[in-house]
Design a protein with these regions (language model features):
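N-terminal secretory signal peptides that target proteins for export/translocation
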Residues: 1-12
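Short, solvent-exposed beta-strand edge segments and adjacent coil->beta transition regions
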Residues: 34, 116, 121-123, 165-167, ...
């Protein structure tokens, strides 16, 4: 079990135990929303260790309100501007130029999320959902992308090549192959700051949907389903800009090298992280992670060669018009 799993479990036996639990409880586990509850589905190396940004448990809990129901505390947003990417068919969301709060207040997150600071970004576009098996297969068919390291998922022996899962997020793709796909599609990986703004909006929400803890309609997390779900399955969990699946489902690669906000040469205007390093960053948490670990400010430092069954990505590109 790799280091991100250690953040969740603390033991190398966690994966095997989860598989046993899931196998015994398949009939009783929570299911993803039905097709009528879903928004439309949009179609646009060597395994190494992965470590969380902090191995120790957080010293305090974030200021999160307990949900009285599973409904979001704000209306589901309707994106003001969208477009379809010509190369991969992804629906993309316009994120306007402006400031947002990045990171966490002391006592509300983990140490590498401090200090919370104001960042200004130029306008950009970002995929509404994670890149799917269907989309990634088109890049492989063009001879540009490598196939995922494995064709399975956490509980499914056949996943990547199974027509049943075409519109589920591609997994077992390392940072290099994620970037290769985005370039093939005429895009790039989002910066860490771009990803966080798209996830939490300008007000610094704890989660994409607001400041209440997730419920079963917000996200795929904490083994409620036990594996990936179809992209776009949780419209109640949309961010203020309409981005979906930015909490749970699969972690997502971003462009930056990992660095502490307090020690790295971190700009407050269009930051891009350190100039070099040993680890890249993944964001968003996954279907395995607890509510605390799918917060929009949570950071994971990951070897760029790493690939796993709960790690995917989405793409972005800079806007010409601001």
């Amino acid at each position: 079990v790799a280091g991100v799993r250690a953040k969740v479990s603390g033991t190398s036996a966690f994966r095997g135990l989860l598989l046993v639990i899931i196998t015994l409880a398949l009939c009783g586990c929570a299911e993803a929303p039905t097709a009528t509850e879903r928004v439309a589905t949009f179609s646009p190396f060597v395994e190494d260790e992965v470590r969380s940004s902090s191995q120790a448990a957080p010293t305090s809990n974030p200021t999160i309100l307990s949900p009285a129901t599973h409904q979001p505390d704000t209306p589901i947003p309707t994106p003001a501007r969208t477009q379809m990417a010509l190369d991969d068919g992804a629906i993309m969301l316009f994120i306007p130029k402006g400031d947002f709060l990045m990171g966490s207040l002391k006592g509300e997150g983990e140490k590498d999320e401090y200090p919370q600071h104001t960042v200004q970004l130029n306008a950009f576009w970002i995929d509404q959902t994670e890149v799917t098996n269907r989309m990634y297969r088109a890049c492989v068919a063009d001879g540009v992308c490598n196939e995922p390291r494995r064709s399975s998922s956490f509980t499914r022996e056949e996943y990547y090549g199974n027509p049943q899962y075409l519109d589920y997020p591609v997994v077992y793709v390392n940072w290099f192959d994620a970037g290769r796909y985005c370039r093939w599609a005429g895009k790039r990986l989002p910066s860490e700051a771009e990803w966080e703004k798209a996830a939490r909006g300008s007000e610094g929400f704890i989660y994409p949907w607001g400041n209440i803890e997730p419920g079963t309609l917000h996200a795929n997390y904490d083994l409620l389903v036990g594996d990936t779900t179809e992209t776009g399955s949780y419209p109640a969990g949309a961010s203020p800009y309409g981005a979906l699946d930015m909490a749970g489902n699969v972690m997502e690669w971003v462009l930056d090298w990992y660095g502490e906000y307090t020690t790295s040469p971190y700009k407050t205007y269009d930051p891009s992280g350190p100039e070099n390093g040993a680890h890249r960053i993944a964001r968003g948490g996954s279907y395995l992670f607890s509510p605390f670990l799918i917060r929009s400010a949570e950071r994971y430092w990951v070897s760029p060669y790493y690939a796993d069954d709960d790690l995917g990505f989405r793409c972005a590109f800079s806007a010409v018009d601001q």
